[in-house]
Design a protein with these regions (language model features):
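A short acidic, Gly/Pro-enriched loop at the edge of an enzyme's catalytic core
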Residues: 101-112
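Short, glycine-/aromatic-enriched active-site segment of Class I SAM-dependent methyltransferases
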Residues: 146-165
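Conserved Class I S-adenosyl-L-methionine
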Residues: 189-250
Length: 250
């Protein structure tokens, strides 16, 4: 457990200061918001696995409603609130440091649940089952999940995912999973691969350059894993990536 905790601490340090802790794009997020069905006035919103707040800030600007922003890392939450203060949005965002799989909120208390690149931490299936009771009647969820884009997966990708993300499924399998978990899929949109590079991997490279070869074995292991991930995506970005699932509670 100690080794795992050290690895996570190094992972947080590597991503500290970045606008995003995973692939995404503000323009794409705004596009997704435009696809949502009509929400109640002043919707109750949660961003689960918010990281440094890239999504929460967009949601606050768009809806002018209070956002419950959940993450396990105080480092990222503090970074989010500094950015929120710079934009005058601090009163709209409530930072919540906790385990996303153990939210003790009232059932039916969320109108829009938003989660980008975080559900895998408790498995996509686990996230659907855990978060479904939180949604109000006809509540809407937007959850992004890394998945295969077809049933034909290159062997090198399948081998990598066996240890990196053994729970990965195809887009079609995730659609079926959503529809059998108390939701109905409204739309699915794939995050363009350029969003991985422009908004995540390229900025991350600067942090890697600053922290590489510092003599910290744990950090070096994190960097090695991250560079392996980058190299795989560069070669096989047409075969897998993030899909944004828009769904409603049924």
């Amino acid at each position: 457990m100690e080794g795992f905790e050290q690895y996570i601490e190094a992972l947080i340090s590597l991503h500290s200061g970045l606008e995003r802790q995973g692939p995404g794009d503000p323009g794409f997020s705004e596009f997704i918001i435009e696809q949502l069905p009509q929400l109640p006035q002043n919707p109750r919103i949660a961003d689960i696995g918010c990281g440094a707040g890239a999504g929460a800030l967009i949601l606050a600007r768009k809806f002018h409603s209070r956002i419950r922003a959940v993450d396990f890392s105080k480092v990222f939450l503090d970074q989010m609130m500094r950015r929120a203060a710079q934009e005058g949005l601090q009163d709209l965002i409530e930072p919540i440091e906790c385990d996303m799989g153990k939210l003790d909120w009232q059932p039916g208390s969320i109108d829009l649940l938003w989660s980008e690149g975080a559900a895998y931490n408790i498995s996509f299936e686990g996230a659907l089952k855990t978060w479904r009771p939180l949604l109000a009647a006809n509540g809407v969820a937007v959850i992004s999940e890394m998945n295969y884009f077809s049933n034909k997966v290159p062997d090198v990708v399948a081998k990598y995912m066996k240890h990196a993300y053994p729970g990965i499924k195809t887009e079609s399998e995730n659609n079926d999973l959503i529809n059998s978990s108390g939701f109905r899929v409204l739309a699915v949109h794939r995050l363009p691969s350029i969003a991985w590079w422009d908004n995540y991997y390229d900025p991350l490279r600067d942090n890697i350059a600053a922290l590489k070869d510092t003599g910290d074995d744990v950090m070096q292991a994190v960097i090695n894993d991250t560079e392996e991930e980058m190299n795989l995506f560069r070669a096989y970005q047409d075969d897998y990536g993030y899909s944004y699932y828009i769904m409603c509670a049924v």
